[in-house]
Structures are given as C-alpha cells and as structure tokens.
C-alpha cells in the first residue's frame, strides 16, 4: 500500500504519519513539499518527524544541503520561516529564549541548549541555534553575540548595542553591531 498526499489543507505530514500507522508500506514525499497546486508532503518535515518519533534512525545532517540543492534546481525558493531548513528555523532574537539557551550552554548541556526552545534539535539536521540581537532581546543576547564573534564583553559595549537594539524595530545585522563595536573600541594608536 502506497500513500500519496498533497498539502491542500496543510496535513501532508500528518496524513503520511497516519498512513504509516495504518499499515502503508510506503509514503510519497518531495523535498520542501514541491508539487502540484500547493505541493506534496514535505519530505524534510516527514523525515524529521519520523526520526523524532523513533520510527527511523537516519543521519539527517545533510538534509538542509539537499533541500537547498532541490530549491536551486527547481527555482522554488525556501521561505525564511520554513520549518527545519528555512533561514529562520533556528534563529531567535527573544531575550527569554536566548537566556535559556545560553544558560544550558554555560552548564555544558548542549543537548538541552539545542532543545529548550526548539521542537527540533538543530544539530539533528546539521544546523545550529543562532542568537540574534533585536528589540525583544535581553542583555544575554548581546553578550552571546559578542562572545560568538570573539569580541571582549565590556559593559559599555553591551549597553550601547543593547540600547541600539531597543530603539530598533527589527533584528540588527552583523554589520550594524560591528559598526557599534568599532566606534566604541579604542584603536591601537589611541592606547
């Protein structure tokens, strides 16, 4: 028995799981759900759910690369907010989320850090949790960003970046933050 589902009502993955539960031998799916009308069952989402349910045990760390390849080959873009392989799938600029991830990392608990605010562990699909700085960020976001970029965490630098983030209506990009860093970092000639 084969099952072939579409995304007309957004239930491709759920219906595929139910089909397998009911005894289907095979379910059809496509990378990033590419298919007629609104698409077929998204293979990437199906595989991740099968893995998380313990129904399969596969190395999914190249799934993102595969979906990027499918996107380029077909000309179908991956939306930024697409689950698992979208640009924003593992990004957060929210203070409470970042604080929990950072706290787990500081305790050496990478397993928890990868799951505390994500229903899918980023490492399972070859990705990483990314902490950004924006208007909903906390001080810990700024400290983490500086640390991740090898920049010493100094109070005046943290305060300046944090203030700029709070005045913004969006996530700050790396260039904006680096500009603030360079503006507040003494040059070698001034020392």
Task: Tell me what each language-model feature is.
Residues 5-11, 31-35:
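Active-site-proximal loop/turn and secondary-structure-junction residues that shape catalytic pockets
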Residues 9-22, 41:
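Catalytic cores of alpha/beta
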Residues 22-39:
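Glycine-rich phosphate-binding active-site loops on the catalytic face of alpha/beta enzymes
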């Amino acid at each position: 028995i084969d099952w072939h589902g579409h995304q007309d009502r957004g239930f491709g993955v759920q219906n595929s799981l139910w089909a397998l539960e009911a005894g289907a031998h095979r379910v059809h799916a496509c990378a990033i759900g590419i298919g007629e009308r609104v698409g077929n069952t998204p293979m990437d989402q199906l595989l991740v759910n099968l893995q998380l349910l313990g129904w399969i045990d596969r190395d999914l760390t190249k799934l993102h690369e595969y979906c990027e390849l499918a996107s380029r080959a077909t000309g179908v873009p991956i939306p930024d907010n697409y689950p698992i392989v979208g640009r924003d799938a593992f990004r957060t600029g929210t203070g409470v989320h970042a604080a929990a991830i950072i706290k787990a990392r500081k305790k050496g608990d990478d397993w928890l850090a990868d799951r505390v605010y994500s229903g899918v562990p980023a490492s399972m699909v070859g990705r990483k949790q990314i902490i950004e700085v924006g208007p909903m960020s906390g001080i810990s976001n700024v400290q983490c960003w500086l640390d991740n970029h090898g920049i010493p965490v100094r109070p005046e630098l943290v305060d300046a970046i944090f203030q700029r983030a709070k005045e913004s209506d969006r996530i700050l990009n790396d260039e904006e933050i680096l500009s603030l860093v360079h503006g507040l970092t003494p040059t070698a000639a001034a020392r």
